[in-house]
């Protein structure tokens, strides 16, 4: 049995109150302050994971009890020792690979310092985050009746780690793609590269709102801390995959637009009859986030290496982890928004509201 660990942290108040209901009565700022002095702890033992190849894995969730606000506001050199301490706990439990969740892989140098301080390989899971965002977007577009080969796509944050690799791959599937970022020079370099290697018409823009208005599908991965997409920016029937943390899409889109589908990227179904994460993190049973799935896939494959670290992700990495996911029986299983699954009936309703009569067949991400 292969062993892995995944280090995570609370995203919002209910992540604390789920474990300690008494905290519902306490102001959230107080809870944040108290818990930032609490050392990392093992949350649960993960069992029952079995690949379709017969390989098995077990693992542990280890929590660093800091919220996104604290992680972003605390100096990086003070955050790293907290994550490293959690990593040492993982090593003591026998983990052969360690994954980093949510903001733990965003702060500072995206896992590089943490990996350097540990003896066990570390991955951010961003390769499969990109792969599943692409799969999720193409699947959602098909469910909304959008034919990818005729579609206009926009990638916001196109020059970042996940954004540039998403843009390179998405351009192979669509008619037209608009790359959005703040740095025009880097945008034009990426535009040139994509135009050379695909048949898509490639545009660049530094204005996300105008670029979004003409798009059938949008992948948002900007590191901007403010909201970039408002309800009035989207055309009816559009699909938006918001991979960014903090989010790029305003919560008002969900409240005011019943004719657009906003997803957080794919929910991944993890293989095994009796998969038990031993902890409720807001997903249906046997389902997990892509960065958790990447860590498990690497364990099952016995690829004990720093598969995804830092800010450079190659197309080959995304394609490889997507193939390995398929090999071991992991699949994108529906969609989620604000960490909650979106039921099929809701997707149907949104499609009808957009005036699209039926869904179409999704393209294959990896040929």
Predicted regions span which residues?
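Adenosine-phosphate binding glycine-rich loop
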Residues: 2, 6-7, 20-28, 32-35, ...
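Conserved acidic residues
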Residues: 3-5, 96, 175, 216, ...
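Glycine/serine-rich phosphate-binding loop and adjoining beta1-alpha1 elements at the start
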Residues: 49-146, 277-283, 289, 301
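A short helix-to-beta-strand connector/capping loop
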Residues: 56-58, 118-120, 197-203, 258
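N-terminal Rossmann-like NAD(P) cofactor-binding subdomain of oxidoreductases
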Residues: 101-110, 118-120, 126, 131-132, ...
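Glycine-rich phosphate/diphosphate-binding loop of Rossmann-like nucleotide-binding domains
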Residues: 142-217
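Rossmann-like adenosine-cofactor binding region
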Residues: 199-275
